[in-house]
Swiss-Prot record:
Catalytic activity: benzoate + S-adenosyl-L-methionine = methyl benzoate + S-adenosyl-L-homocysteine
GO molecular function terms listed in the Swiss-Prot or TrEMBL record: metal ion binding; methyltransferase activity
Species: Petunia hybrida (Petunia)
Protein name in UniProt: S-adenosyl-L-methionine:benzoic acid/salicylic acid carboxyl methyltransferase 3
Gene3D superfamilies: Methyltransferase, alpha-helical capping domain, Vaccinia Virus protein VP39
Chain positions recorded as S-adenosyl-L-homocysteine binding sites: 18, 59, 64, 96-97, 135-136
Function: Converts benzoic acid into the volatile ester methyl benzoates. This scent, mostly produced in a rhythmical, diurnal manner, attracts the pollinators.
InterPro entries documented for this protein: MeTrfase_7, MeTrfase_capping, SAM-dependent_MTases_sf
Coiled-coil annotated spans: none
């Protein structure tokens, strides 16, 4: 499985689309707003750029993508008015892997711009937008061309399934039953990928440029702790139930692994300091409930829909597409049972960085 070819959120605007099932991600963006706001204020008041070049890495599609744009424009407009300056030109780069539904994203752009003008008037900008398909574990932009890099709920995804994890039988991710070699392989791939991310962004950001990165993570130093692995353990349970029913071959489940690593703040800090191009302004964690909806009764349904929007393309690349309704129905039942018995939360790691030179 080539991750770069199959990793993307469900496109379009259907029942299983990411656009209609990304409330958790929206809440996380709103929770992170004060950190984004401070980074943008510090950036603008130190550089006063006439053109602001901003990259949203792992932008996906839907309202959340434009929520980030709206936040940034409003922050800068408020700040530049304080100083009595003319509004800068905004240049937003939307980056994601080639399988992302860029068409749906850009079809919504006109309506978003019109709505933004209604809220803050005609005096800002102009704003320019471009789509940049490609992996953020490679170079994406010219040297020293960016002022600000934003990424939310993307950097936990790895560039590939780690090598040497063939013995992770019965699991689809790191779990307490995973051999130590599997845990080490996952961390090694994360270390390679995040180090490359920092290296390439250090080349693309100008001196004094900022990054605000939010990713699924963990507070524990145990990479197999429930706070980061449980959601995938439950999906593995659903798949293994279908194995027992004879609908999926056991070898198919054994050969499937999620290309993701959810780091602790200490792991993020270590790699940032090791790479050496950035200072850490803030590094913190937050929590968000699996069921971000106010509809508590349908919690299992809401969470399984959210996870389907995220994971279905990966699953379809390995299992029969016709099985997906059954897989996620099983998953919903398992999640509902789990949520009735225990507290279920995602842990977020947020880091704000400044480019040193």
């Amino acid at each position: 499985m080539e991750v770069v070819e199959v990793l993307h959120m469900n496109g379009g605007n259907g029942d299983s689309s990411y656009a209609n099932n990304s409330l958790v991600q929206q809440k996380v963006i709103l929770m992170t707003k004060p950190i984004t706001e401070q980074a943008m204020i510090d950036l603008y008041s130190s550089l006063f750029p006439e053109t602001l070049c901003i990259a949203d890495l792992g932008c996906s599609l839907g309202a959340n993508t434009f929520l980030v744009v709206s936040q940034i424009v409003k922050i800068v407009e408020k700040e530049r008015k304080k100083h009595g300056f003319k509004s800068p030109e905004f240049y937003f780069h939307f980056n994601d892997l080639p399988g992302n539904d860029f068409n749906t994203l850009f079809q919504s752009l006109g309506a978003f711009q019109e709505d933004l003008r209604k809220h803050i008037g005609e005096s800002f900008g102009p704003c320019f937008f471009s789509g940049v398909p490609g992996s953020f574990y490679t170079r994406l932009f010219p040297s020293k061309s960016l002022h600000f890099v934003y990424s939310s709920y993307s950097l936990m995804w790895l560039s590939q399934v780690p090598n040497g994890i063939e013995n992770n039988k019965g699991n689809i991710y790191m779990a307490r039953t995973s051999p130590l070699s599997v845990i080490k392989a996952y961390y090694k791939q994360y270390e390679i990928d995040f180090s490359n991310f920092l290296k390439y962004r250090s080349e693309e950001l100008m001196k004094g440029g900022k990054m605000v990165l939010t990713l699924l993570g963990r507070e524990s130093e145990d990479p197999t702790s429930k706070e980061c692995c449980y959601i995938w353990e439950l999906l593995a349970m659903a798949l293994n139930e279908l194995v027992k029913e004879g609908l999926i071959k056991e070898e198919k489940v054994d050969a499937f692994n999620i290309p993701q690593y959810t780091p602790s703040p200490a792991e993020v800090k270590y790699l940032v300091e090791k790479e050496g191009s950035f200072t850490i302004n803030r590094l913190e964690t937050s929590r968000v409930h699996w069921n971000a909806s106010n509809n508590v009764k349908n919690g299992g349904y809401n969470v399984s829909r959210c996870m389907r929007a995220v994971a279905e393309p990966l699953l379809v690349s390995h299992f029969d597409k016709e099985l997906m309704d059954l897989v996620f129905h099983k998953y919903e039942e398992i999640i509902s049972d789990c949520m009735s018995k225990e507290k279920t939360e995602f842990i977020n790691v947020i880091v704000s960085l400044t480019k040193i030179n």
